[in-house]
Amino acid sequence: MKEKVFEAIKKSGKNGIRLRDIGYYCNVWHVSCLEYVAELMEEGKVYGKTIGHGWQAYIKYYVKED
């Protein structure tokens, strides 16, 4: 499952991807993907960026390029 989450983030490219869209790609509830995204962030493969502000803010995830 972690590999599938990473694949979804990688496919998004420079546009990034929201957690909700990762869940849609993996065909699971998006909150269940959060654990895998956190693991990928700890490993240094993925980073998150907050878009917007207030109640309309969301996080997009990107693959770190070496």
Predicted features along the sequence, with ranges:
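Short, leucine-enriched amphipathic alpha-helices that occur as contiguous helical runs
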Residues: M1-F6
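Short helix-to-turn junction characteristic of helix-turn-helix DNA-binding domains
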Residues: I9-G13
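Short acidic, hydrophobic short linear motifs in intrinsically disordered regions
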Residues: N15-Y25
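Short secondary-structure boundary/hinge segments and terminal tails
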Residues: N27, M41, A57-I59
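Short amphipathic alpha-helical interaction segments
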Residues: N27-E39
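A short, conserved structural fragment
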Residues: M41-I51
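Short, cationic-aromatic polyanion-contact patches
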Residues: K49-D66
